[in-house]
Amino acid sequence: VPPHMHGYYPTSVSYPSIVGEMLASGFSIIGFSWICSPACTELEVVVMDWLAKFLKLPEHFLHATEGPGGGVIQGSASEAVLVAVLAAREQAVCRVRASHPELSESDIRGKLVAYSSDQSNSCIEKAGVLAAMPIKLLPAGEDLILRGAALRSAIEQDVTAGLIPVICIATLGTTGTCAYDDVDSLATVCEQYNVWLHVDAAYAGGAFALDECSELRRGLERVDSLNFNLHKFMLVNFDCSAMWLRDANKVVDSFNVDRIYLKHKYEGQTQIPDFRHWQIPLGRRFRALKVWITFRTLGAEGLRAHVRKHIELAKKFEVFVLADARFELVAPRALGLVCFRAKGENEITAQLLQRLMERKKIYMVKAEHRGQLFLRFAVCGMDPKPSDIEFAWTEIGTQLTALLAEQEHLAAVGKAGDVTELTQQFGLQLTNGTNEKSQ
């Protein structure tokens, strides 16, 4: 990603990852089961446990521990969320059919409902469309955080109406402002109503590895599944999204479609999973190889340093914003994202962005919250530097100065035009009055 691309969350890349991608392409493995490529499956088990320990996730998400939990590499957060939604849906259908045999499957499916925040990513709403299950986007609080109280209120209303709550998708690092939903309070409600809780930590998950960001991990021991994009913070190129499940059997049981040509004598063993049951497609790429090479080359401290660099550079940009009275923050800086706007009407911010896009020196996108238009500045690039931040801020400040000067000039011209018009009208009236007196 170019260092002056600040519109979206970063898409990482590194030379070790590129080498791993090239090797994986050369091997051309379609690792849907252990028997077709033991190395593909076993290396993925290893790196997913490495990553879980690196991010300090609860032990029940590790393959190495006793229990049905484990991790798998999906292509994207969209795939991971869809897998969670589909698995939760099938589990709910089975559970309700067992307790209410008088209901038909179609009756049950027509009553299913899911929940997320109105600040969540579009892929969550799309997962509901693909799963034929409505996802209600609950209003986040003034601080952009979804809490258990809002979820409880929605579930109570739906249960009273005869609906069946299925899953809640919480977000750690929302797309608009990088807000963090209150996972702990959401988990309390989900446990009470037997609702699957999934956490989409596509961006913020990289900060789990930092001791200073330990608060982000609060409540993760209570969730059923979570995902994190390695291609955002971990210097692994797209596509590569890690997903962990507390009980992988719930996904396997929901997606298991066997054929005789797919069976082998080792299937069913917990230490050698057939990952085809953990995902949407049958075939799968050897993504674990680029993760393994990147981790081995850069090391845990190298990856932590990369995340910290993004955070420090965002702090630098935040200082620039706070020091300029013409700008204001819309939300607190979060990790490598700063949300800000030009003070005044939304039109000023919109015109500022238009000028920046026309000049093509930096790239940003706009977002909106509570009727306020704002700009998102995300630190990006394989090796971002302070000079990149300074360049971007200089460009933004210069263009706002030019925009305000242009508006002042137009306003002055408008006032001058009004005065001229009034003078002409007044002069015409004086002339007419003089002529009448002469006559």
Swiss-Prot record:
Any one GO BP annotation for this protein: catecholamine metabolic process
Entry's EC annotation: 4.1.1.107
PROSITE patterns, per the entry: DDC_GAD_HDC_YDC
GO terms, molecular function: 3,4-dihydroxyphenylacetaldehyde synthase activity; aromatic-L-amino-acid decarboxylase activity; pyridoxal phosphate binding; structural constituent of cuticle
Keywords: Catecholamine metabolism, Cuticle, Lyase, Pyridoxal phosphate
This protein's record includes keyword Cell membrane: no
Function: Involved in cuticle development. Probably responsible for the protein cross-linking during the development of flexible cuticles.
Protein name: 3,4-dihydroxyphenylacetaldehyde synthase 2
Gene name linked to the record: amd
